[in-house]
Curated annotation (Swiss-Prot):
Disruption phenotype: Maternal-effect lethality and sterility. Primordial germ cells (PGCs) do not proliferate normally and death of germ cells may be as a result of necrosis or increased apoptosis. Increased proportion of oocytes with fragmented chromosomes as a result of irradiation. Tumorous germline phenotype that is suppressed on a rfp-1;glp-1 double mutant background. Germline progression from leptotene/zygotene to pachytene is defective. GO terms for cellular component: autosome; chromatin; euchromatin; NuA4 histone acetyltransferase complex; nucleus. Residues 75-113 are annotated as: Disordered. PANTHER family: MORTALITY FACTOR 4 LIKE 2, MORTALITY FACTOR 4-LIKE PROTEIN. Expressed in oocytes (at protein level). Expressed mainly in germ cells, but also at lower levels in several somatic cell types, including intestinal cells. Residues 122-327 form the MRG domain. It comes from Caenorhabditis elegans. The keyword DNA repair applies. GO terms for biological process: chromosome attachment to the nuclear envelope; chromosome organization involved in meiotic cell cycle; DNA repair; embryo development ending in birth or egg hatching; germ cell development; heterochromatin formation; negative regulation of transcription by RNA polymerase II; positive regulation of transcription by RNA polymerase II. This is Mortality factor related protein 1. Its main location: nucleus.
Length: 337
């Protein structure tokens, strides 16, 4: 028997997200595999990656009749800062306003469509707040490594594949993709305008940063994982016919960690990214763009982590020989030891 529905498909509503009202729309009412009816809620002006499914009958504190402004006035609630004049704040605190189209690849204008205008943050403001499911991945990862399990590499879903999947969700035309390396930031007084192309550029930049960080002095690797990394570099070099006894040739072999490692190691980098960025000479506008892109990517990872992470199935026990070699590994400087 169907539950009584207080809202209809196509109805404009106010939906509460992280304690604040946003204008939204009921786009559909679906039934899941358990026979539970769900409201499909789309936040107006946001990419569909933010869509939510709220069980019918459990929407009491989430969905309300009317607009966000009407809800705020009636309940004496604060409107989200994205609906007001931008203020200086941590961009990881709440989901950014997203003006992208819902269908990828439909943008036809010559100018990249703007995603959001956000206040400029300084290096001291930087913060990456991983959602609980992503934090749990890192906690479980630490526990498994401490029990002498190692992440299986190459991973089924590499960082390169994850970022490729993410980029596919960002609506840009083929013409715009060909200009992805052009100027992507527009300054408006104290604010910064972020385009869809800027999100793509930032995501690709994070991959490059990941490759440098993981491959430099064993950053992002626990000491127990270092022999695995060295073995993998040598294996890939031998496959290319490179002399592995030549340190210079091995270093220039073109090994890309992003082709081998998956979401766990990428999350390790994101969690420490503010500390890394403070060591750079980039100005506040560049840092601001990066952090907005990071947050948008985290939303994607949180929504899709079940595809890219399988828990303990992504790990394997180490052999006795491997364990002995890990104890003899050099003490390099690493973010995780």
């Amino acid at each position: 028997m169907s539950s009584k529905k207080n809202f209809e498909v196509g109805e404009n509503v106010a939906c509460i997200y992280k304690g604040k009202p946003y204008d939204a729309k009921i786009t559909d009412i679906k039934t899941n595999s358990d026979g539970k009816e769900l409201y499909c809620v789309h936040f107006k002006g946001w990419n569909n990656r933010y869509d939510e499914k709220i069980p019918v009958g459990e929407e009491k504190d989430r969905i309300f009749k009317g607009t966000a402004s009407e809800y705020a006035e009636k309940h004496n609630a604060e409107l989200p800062t994205t609906a007001l004049k931008p203020k200086k704040k941590s961009l990881a605190a709440e989901a950014p306003r997203d003006d992208r189209d819902d269908t990828p690849g439909t943008s036809k204008g010559k100018k990249a469509k703007s995603v959001t205008i956000a206040p400029v943050m300084t290096a001291d403001d930087m913060k990456v707040e991983l959602p609980k499911p992503l934090r749990k991945i890192l906690i479980d990862d630490y526990d498994l490594v401490c029990r002498y399990f190692i992440n299986i590499v190459p991973h089924e879903y590499s960082v390169d594949q994850i970022i490729e999947d993410y980029i596919k969700t960002i609506p840009v035309s083929n013409e715009q993709m060909r200009t992805v390396d052009d100027l992507l930031i527009e300054y408006e007084e104290a604010d910064i305008k972020i385009t869809n192309l800027a999100l793509i550029c930032t995501a690709r930049g994070l991959v490059d940063y990941f490759n440098v960080t993981l491959g430099s002095s064993y950053q992002l690797l626990y000491k127990f994982e270092r022999p695995q990394y060295n073995d993998l570099v040598k294996k890939r070099a031998m496959e290319k016919g490179i002399d592995i006894t030549n340190p210079t040739a091995l270093q220039d072999s073109g090994f890309r960690p992003s082709q081998e490692y998956g979401i766990v190691h990428f999350l390790r980098m994101l969690a420490k990214l503010p500390d890394y960025l403070k060591l750079t000479q980039w100005n506040d506008h560049v840092i601001n763009r990066i952090m907005i892109g990071v947050h948008d990517l985290i939303v994607f990872l949180n929504k899709n982590h079940g595809k890219y992470y399988r828990g303990s199935s992504d790990y394997q026990g180490a052999s006795n020989d491997y364990y002995r070699r890990s104890l003899a590994a050099d003490d390099g400087v690493g973010a995780n030891q």
